[in-house]
Amino acid sequence: MKIAILPGDGIGPEIIAQAERVLEVLRRDGLKIETEHAPLGGAAYDQYGVPYPEATQKLAREADAVLLGAVGGPAYDKLDRPLRPERGLLAIRKDLNLFANLRPAILYPELANASTLKPEVVAGLDIMIVRELTGDIYFGQPRGIAVNELGEREAYNTMRYSESEVRRIAHVAFGIAMKRNRKLCSVDKANVLETTEFWKEIMIEVAKEYPQVELSHMYVDNAAMQLVRNPKQFDVMVTGNIFGDILSDEASMLTGSIGMLPSASLDQNNKGLYEPSHGSAPDIAGQNLANPLATILSAAMMLRYSFGQEAAARRVEDAVKKVLAQGYRTADIYEAGCEKVSCSGMGDAVVAAM
């Protein structure tokens, strides 16, 4: 199991270090894990002048999975767009043909008070959002900023999906629904956008291959509202790139801390890029304050989806549950009566729990 470790920017190196400690425990206990580091994002720009350099490309392609910290930061905001850290993330997703983004939103019982919603609204919350990653308005051509025939500046982007792109993400979502509670909600804006009307048609066609799964449809504006009003009605949600980007961030905050939430981006063969759902948090970088649990749980997702190591994945997840039950909290999830720990302190607790 060769893993490319890309610490990235901001708090990335700190949180990745704790995930590596967890992998080291598993390696000591017999899992054949091999790791190698490379830069991505701002760190890569600082070193190579580009956010996704050739050395990183080579390692990412050769590895069986990629574990990433976070990319970005205000220091890079003035760079030309192709050189910005986020472009490195888009490029590696494209390069590795990662088309399915899985974002779980799980509320741990111990953190029920961390959510801004009433505990009874979010108790037992466990949603999986499946987001298509390589199509839609983020990648559609033409795009740009230009001067029109009236001599006025204008900007334009193109929302576009091919049938094969929608079909393959549909199969991923239905497959996940089959392993869970057999409920799938497809989110679109079919009343206004032809692209998502097309999306809905294909979802209905693919559903015929999964008669055990109950498929429902919801407009994106209503879905955003329902996630706050009654989130427990959802089990698996599937949607396009831009809607998924927004809804998965919204769902993450139902849980009280984005610092708790992992994510996976998979290709056709379950090779994946695994990263926490949060950003690089430059305001707390280097202070040993970050919450490493999302990154540790991303490593657990990697063990499950890319390596089929279900027992190892559960061992990591159970260790996280145990440290929360023991009352350990980083600053972002701290509440009175708990024990506040640093980033490395949380790593210590998880390793001890394993």
Curated annotation (Swiss-Prot):
Q: Its pathway?
A: Amino-acid biosynthesis; L-leucine biosynthesis; L-leucine from 3-methyl-2-oxobutanoate: step 3/4
Q: Where does substrate bind?
A: R93, R103, R131, D221
Q: Which residues bind Mg(2+)?
A: D221, D245, D249
* Annotated binding of NAD(+), by residue: 73-86, 279-291
Q: Where are the transmembrane segments?
A: none
- List UniProt keywords, sorted A-Z: Amino-acid biosynthesis, Branched-chain amino acid biosynthesis, Cytoplasm, Leucine biosynthesis, Magnesium, Manganese, Metal-binding, NAD, Oxidoreductase
**Annotated localization:** Cytoplasm
One record GO biological process: L-leucine biosynthetic process
What are the annotated GO cellular component locations?
cytosol
Comment on bound cofactor: Binds 1 Mg(2+) or Mn(2+) ion per subunit.
Tell me the Gene3D superfamilies matching this sequence: Isopropylmalate Dehydrogenase
Cofactor(s), by name: Mg(2+); Mn(2+)
Where mainly found? Answer: cytoplasm
Keyword Oxidoreductase attached: yes
Which GO terms of the molecular function aspect are on file? 3-isopropylmalate dehydrogenase activity; magnesium ion binding; NAD binding
Site (Important for catalysis): residue numbering on this chain: Y138, K189
User: What InterPro entries does UniProt report for this protein, alphabetically?
Assistant: IsoCit/isopropylmalate_DH_CS, IsoPropMal-DH-like_dom, Isopropylmalate_DH
- What does this chain do? Catalyzes the oxidation of 3-carboxy-2-hydroxy-4-methylpentanoate (3-isopropylmalate) to 3-carboxy-4-methyl-2-oxopentanoate. The product decarboxylates to 4-methyl-2 oxopentanoate.
Give the quaternary structure: Homodimer.
What protein does this entry describe? 3-isopropylmalate dehydrogenase
